């Protein structure tokens, strides 16, 4: 935008992106980060600036900001505890809209070796969550029946319906973002979810 002589403060831009992000997380369709920038331009009355640079900006985003995003504080300890207790661990995550990008990011995570199976919904399956197929596929890859699986998620709009729809127990971790839904259990953190699992 600077090249076009248009200047906005980074604070205002990030505030708008945050609101767009929350809205997109509340929907039940493929989360394409390119839409971030297109929506932002539309809100700023700058739709005429759309072009190839939008996707280039998305790629830059993943290489910088998202690449440096920290895990939740209890992620590693939770995974280690569950692994030690004999749980078989897998992950279901929606595609970012850029083929291969989500898996590339997952491969960089320190917990990768603890996962026995990974499903990128929207790439390994035709539909993203809450479609049931990503959930049945992760169970298949783990060699388990869905009713013998527990799904821990933090987005009520995408995680509850799909997991419970195939017969999995569903634990929802309360985070910022969309509210609602009817999980089997509600947890304040991954650590709390672990305690629930140990009890059941």
Please place each PLM-identified region on the residue numbering.
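Asp-based, Mg2+/Mn2+-dependent phosphohydrolase catalytic module
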Residues: 8, 49, 76, 80-83, ...
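N-terminal helical cap/lid subdomain that shapes the substrate entry/recognition surface
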Residues: 1-80, 84-85
């Amino acid at each position: 935008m600077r090249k076009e002589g248009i200047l906005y403060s980074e604070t205002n831009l990030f505030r708008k992106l945050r609101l767009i992000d929350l809205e997109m997380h509340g929907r039940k369709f493929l989360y394409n980060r390119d839409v971030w920038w297109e929506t932002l331009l539309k809100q700023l009355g700058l739709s005429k600036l759309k072009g190839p640079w939008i996707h280039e900006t998305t790629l830059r985003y993943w290489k910088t900001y998202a690449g440096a995003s920290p895990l939740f504080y209890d992620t590693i300890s939770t995974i280690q505890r569950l692994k030690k207790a004999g749980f078989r661990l897998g992950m279901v995550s929606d595609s970012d809209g850029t083929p291969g990008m989500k898996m590339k990011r997952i491969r960089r995570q320190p917990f990768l070796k603890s996962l026995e199976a990974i499903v990128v919904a929207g790439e390994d399956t035709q539909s993203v969550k809450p479609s049931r197929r990503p959930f049945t596929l992760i169970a298949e890859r783990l060699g388990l029946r869905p009713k013998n699986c527990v799904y821990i998620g933090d987005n009520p709009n995408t995680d509850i319906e799909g997991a419970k729809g195939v017969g999995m127990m569903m634990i929802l971790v309360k985070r910022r973002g969309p509210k609602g839904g009817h999980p089997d259990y509600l947890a304040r953190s991954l650590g709390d979810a672990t305690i629930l699992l140990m009890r059941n």
